[in-house]
Amino acid sequence: MAAPMEVAVCTDSAAQLWSCVVWELHSGANLLTYRGGQAGPRGLALLNGEYLLAAQLGKNYICAWELQRKDQLQQKIMCPGPVTCLTTSPNGLYVLAGISENIYLWEVSTGNLLVILSRHYQDVSCLQFTGDSSHFISGGKDCLVLAWSLCSVLQADPSRTPAPRHVWSRHTLPITDLHCGFGGPLARVATASLDQTVKLWEVSSGELLLSVLFDVGILAVTMDLAEHYMFCGGSDGSIFQVDLCTWPGQREKSFQPEQEHGKVFRGHRNQVTCLSVSTDGSVLLSGSHDETVRLWDVQSQQCLRTVTLKGPVTNACIMLAPVSMLSSDFRPGLPLPHFNKHLLGAEHGDEPHRGGLMLRLGLHQQGSEPSYLERVEQLQAVMSSTLEKNVLGGQDQLRIRVTELEDEVRNLRKINRDLFDFSTRIITHPTK
């Protein structure tokens, strides 16, 4: 069985020839292009391996393409304002978007807007889910990083504002990027800021594990899958590689390029805006405002390939190509629904049901279907009725059986009495 193909997905702010391009990572061959708009920074996301979503730069809508129908825009998801960042949950159930200082959470299966989170004081700049979709992290221009529990957000009282699980306020300038490692609720999160620091946090405890100070502002951060290295993109075009395994025990330390031989990637002429590492950790992809995307060998820090675009790079990431991306016969399991701009229940003034969720079976079928809870109630009613009938039927059979036994006892007593009388007559009146 052939190994999954790794591809690079890139966008730029010009979008003259296409909105998004996909090329094979190692050969550099162009595989796909998507047309229909300009994707903003931190605004590109893959939904359930079936759709590609792109938040439009300075626009109040999100473009959605079916992966294999690259030339046909599937849907425009209208939003209340310009989308500053976008992400999807790894399980494909939810879409998160930052709009001004608010975070919007949609349910993919229904298109319902479940909640609007308003805990940032300035624009939200980056969003990302943990690998198990149990938590998501948000960073903003207010210098705050918030860790949210998805379960707590969905179960919160509609009359009360959901609270984040952790509030990380150690940065002093706007947050520019964040990266969430593997481990679900035990994951580690790297946050980058214009204050020239990258900080490493633990989701479970909320503790600060590491803070690295650089000489320039950091606009992009990522880690390899094994989390041995952390890569930080600077405003001067440099990319710094931090070895997390051999880092000294102190929690805060300055990164000194002259003392970190071979730990700096140099080649970009302008600020580095996005970074991504291949699954085996051997290749690093970087995008910059110098309108180039570069592929680097991590071991030697040498540039393997340079791809020139038509404008500043807004998104560049490495991913395993989904089956739907390379197969022309593949179709999504479910169509993408219409995404609501208003909270669930608020659009039609349905106050009693605001914030509630209804699980339905067979959403792809036409017509009204009973809800899951209604079906459970019907099943319980049938089971109770059957049990009652069985109990009543058993009592009737018991009464009939008792009557039969009583009749049999009476017959036996009569026979016994007749035998006694016969024996008495024989004894008292012997035959002559």
UniProtKB/Swiss-Prot annotation:
WD repeats lie at residues 36-75, 78-116, 119-158, 170-211, 213-257, 267-306. It holds the Pfam family WD40_alt. It is found in: Nucleus, Nucleolus; Nucleus, Nucleoplasm; Cytoplasm; Dynein axonemal particle. Transmembrane segments: none annotated. Its main location: nucleus. Keywords: Cytoplasm, Developmental protein, Nucleus, Repeat, WD repeat. The keyword Repeat applies. It comes from the Eukaryota. GO terms for biological process: DNA-templated DNA replication; rRNA processing. Functions as a component of the Five Friends of Methylated CHTOP (5FMC) complex; the 5FMC complex is recruited to ZNF148 by methylated CHTOP, leading to desumoylation of ZNF148 and subsequent transactivation of ZNF148 target genes. Component of the PELP1 complex involved in the nucleolar steps of 28S rRNA maturation and the subsequent nucleoplasmic transit of the pre-60S ribosomal subunit. May play a role during development. Belongs to the WD repeat IPI3/WDR18 family. This is WD repeat-containing protein 18. It comes from Bos taurus (Bovine). The lineage of its organism: Eukaryota, Metazoa, Chordata, Craniata, Vertebrata. The gene is WDR18.
